């Protein structure tokens, strides 16, 4: 049981992250749950050192940031599904590492995400994976991780309730985006 394994390890899931744009933290399609890219946040604030791995952070700090990204992904999955026990396996992890020039240990950094998933789900936590070095990530965070899960069963009352939560989050994000656009004033086209 994933939630029991987290408790045994003394790991408490953070509050599910709120979207910072017009998207949902997680979307279910049939028996597949797609979790949006998660950054290393606690209580809505980036928690790890910022910058590029290999310059501003060590590989170990990047590894720790990737673990926190997965904890946020698990929190989003739990909100969407009503519990982590509904996850039957981890399908894929995609990890983005803001990398200094010449840094080539992205797979070691994203092992932070993979290792935690295997610790929590055992063999069902083993997954396909992509580790990519990028120039920059939103908010100057060092790592972003997205996860795809296979889930058990059909939609339940918890799923329907989660849909309402997701709809409210999306409406809230759209309102914030619209308010930001209005506060910036009209955009002007440059003369060519």
Question: Which residue ranges define each predicted feature?
Answer:
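Short, polar/acidic, helix-capping and beta-turn segments at strand->helix junctions
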Residues: 1-192
């Amino acid at each position: 049981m994933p939630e029991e394994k987290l408790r045994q390890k003394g790991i408490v899931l953070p509050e599910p992250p709120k979207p910072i744009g017009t998207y949902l933290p997680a979307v279910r399609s049939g028996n597949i749950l797609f979790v949006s890219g998660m950054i290393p946040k606690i209580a809505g604030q980036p928690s790890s050192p910022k910058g590029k791995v290999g310059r501003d952070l060590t590989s170990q700090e990047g590894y720790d940031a990737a673990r926190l990204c997965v904890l946020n992904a698990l929190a989003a999955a739990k909100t969407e599904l009503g519990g982590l026990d509904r996850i039957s396996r981890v399908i894929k992890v995609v990890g983005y590492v803001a990398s200094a020039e010449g840094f080539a240990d992205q797979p070691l950094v994203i092992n932070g995400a993979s290792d935690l998933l295997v610790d929590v789900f055992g063999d069902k936590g083993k997954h396909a994976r992509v580790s990519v070095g990028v120039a920059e990530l939103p908010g100057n965070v060092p790592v972003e991780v997205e996860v795809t899960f296979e889930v058990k069963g059909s939609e339940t009352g918890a799923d329907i309730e989660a849909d309402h939560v997701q709809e409210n989050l999306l409406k809230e994000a759209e309102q914030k985006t619209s308010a930001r656009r209005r506060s910036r004033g009209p955009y002007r086209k440059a003369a060519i």
